[in-house]
């Protein structure tokens, strides 16, 4: 009844507009001054104009009448079938394009002004060191520095330590890559297990010995294979401080390409394992090998309750500058932080590497002589041709003096008289002889030094935390507090160069196929975690937990660990040997399939009308998977739904916490299909043929695209029936432009295709928000015009190719060393274009030799319709030392500034620096990059991590793939020749600035920037598409299904449910508690936010968790540290929580 009223009102409104238009026109003619001058006689031209306009009005009235009739017919049919929400009804407008009537519902809830204050900033003190400013001010001149080639000569007076002894901590460590030259398992078998076995026996020989370990993935594998006796010994070594687990993540993650979901997840997995098995809680971070450092990591470590951290791979010029200004140790603060709550103490290692020659002091020739693995007769030696000597009574005085000189020089670079000296390298201490050589010789040196009061030195073995504790004690502060006089720093340490102009910016793109697969696995893991947690909570509440497959928890655990393993700094980076990449790929695919099973099992339980009838049968799953991959390096193939006389059902999962209106595309085997909602209403669908190439249709496969409104984190149900063409089945129209290429185009009688041989002029596709223009010759995007603006905005896509240098040093897996600026991509033959238009989406597909591009525009209200969906299927397997790039040219006046995200967590402003080579101006882009001026912002959202830059005014440029034939001398020993056909997916969002132009807050704008709410949602729409799960065909009647609405009320727009993750009782079974991890996003209110189709608002960071989940009670709630090791407050009866902008908060939660 309510729907009838709405339609009647809508139709009446259209009729009124038409009549009023006619009245105005007649009125204008009546008051025409020319008419009065002519004594009331109409000129013939006026009469013909009036006649034309009356005819147009009659046509419009007729169209409106037709629309209203169709709506009435639809309403009658709908109300005859069922009650429920109205369907979207598209119609043709006078100019032949499609339009969709707006839904009779609020399209936007306003944002509270208080929630806009955060992005304006201006609070708190500015840090002394802002990395953007440091980079602008540094000359990057690479002056020869003597024995410390990238530094300077260091001098001291022997009296410098008369008042306070130099305290030296030598920290033995072994850096174990979970895959690089060898696979994870091969490293474990051949090296890592021997390191850890020797550690247990060798540390127990002398309580003064210490050892540092970081990678829990290896440690957990070893733990599973050792005796109870050895486990007890390990616990004792941890308890007495001889063995320290630093950071405690599953791996030492890459900080450029990894998404913050995965960074948090691998940290939780490691910390939970340590707590459960060792009772250990990490205190200090240790990141010696990631290729550049993100400011997201110090935030995560601080929120996990770590107090200190160490980093190593920072641009050599920055290291030199910080060494000269005694700034190598600092409080690292987040850019938005106004009260120092995010501060963490950070130590930056000053020299070239973390190996022994570069850690005792500035002279590697001397330091190498104190790496006792290199004693004569061993397998490795010192490149400086002076070998180590075993320490004896006869030489200890000379050798100790030589080493002390290095210690003293190194200590002059720091503000305290406490010195850190790491002692280790990759896979060190794998043989008992090395343990003996290092520990015996160093102990003799320490004993000698410590026996001489005149040296004013105390040297000993130590752990990283012992070093930090001694520093805090010396400076008179509590652990983690800011020592007096130490600087505060904000910003990040990208991009990294280790020497000359060798910038490690290639790995931002290397092996993009696996960077994409990583994010697919991540989205599936989050979706599976949430659905499993909800299904288990409902099953337990209903007393049905015994029937539910709790064993799925083992699959979740394995997937967590697979995703964690792939965050390793030689995995997601694309910098491992080919065989190791295959091993990672096989693991990723296995976990992806497992997660689809977990999702299917949870969705099955949650959509059943009668859950008492649920039974788990692994042999015959209730739901099919949405897609499948024939191998780890193949693109997915979507499941085709076979229609016959009986209805088929489809369950659609929305992994977003917000309700979404999206076009869901299904593949079916018949063009004659009717789609019904859960309530039995027919839904309008756009039907298209399915193409296998530019001109070939796939026989008997059709794409059905239906707009569906899905509940947040919920499950929708659709019914498919075979049907003759009805009013709800709307065909796409297709044009193919051959551009003179001799090709035959597939044809089907049911789907006419218009073929244009040549001479195509520019053309456009459009929706309610914009008109998008393309070149008729190239098929590439040219411009965008918003419907409410006269002016077109330049938005030109160009493909480019980079070569590599002809000199000895060439690009490889790590390095980007281009031979010159990029050259335009020149195709061997003109492209074939295919334009598809229909009621719910229109798209332009362009086929070139090395890529094919599909740019799609959704004709929907809200988030989906406000950006361009772009995908590029890239195949450069015939390239030799070339890289393919996409450049976007705009008329935005960006003035050399652009913005890239760090780990999908925060935005970092960047400045194009002309003094640096081209490759230095590239940065990681895991999620988005944007340019802006005082009027507009253009954001490129990405579904996979790639390298990005802005090399010219108004430009954004992204490297899509790279094929390189040689090693770049960083240890890998291979080029990048295993390229795959890769699909890179993007969203292009153009926004208009409505308030607060960047100049108003210029200082603040330099150091911080935030996406809009629309941009945040667009990013999530791209990275978490709906999952389409067909109900498997079975004998007999299908059980009744219902949609699943888990949230009783919408989450605030700026809240992101990062994860709802069951905690382990053990590796294979869940506990009763789960971890709820929420992130409140910072956003810029100054970009247009009217009628954008959000069904949410903001709430000043407040959320009532107790009433959030429909049908479930929160029976226990406790705020904890990020990884749940530390309770932050007692469990409370109140379930109301509050988050500050940008903060991630974790809660121990019990649902029942």
Swiss-Prot record:
Annotated GO CC locations: Golgi membrane
**Cofactor needs:** Zn(2+)
Which GO MF terms are attached to this record?
Answer: carbohydrate binding; hydrolase activity, hydrolyzing N-glycosyl compounds; mannosidase activity; mannosyl-oligosaccharide 1,3-1,6-alpha-mannosidase activity; metal ion binding
Glycosylated residues: list them: 225, 305
Please give the Gene3D superfamilies that the UniProt record associates with this protein.
Glycoside hydrolase 38, N terminal domain, Glycoside hydrolase family 38, central domain, Golgi alpha-mannosidase II, Golgi alpha-mannosidase II, domain 4
Q: How is the cofactor bound?
A: Binds 1 zinc ion per subunit.
Lumenal topology: which positions? 27-796
Tell me how this protein assembles: Homodimer; disulfide-linked. Interacts with MGAT4D.
Q: What is this protein called?
A: Alpha-mannosidase 2x
Highest classification ranks of the organism: Eukaryota, Metazoa, Chordata, Craniata, Vertebrata
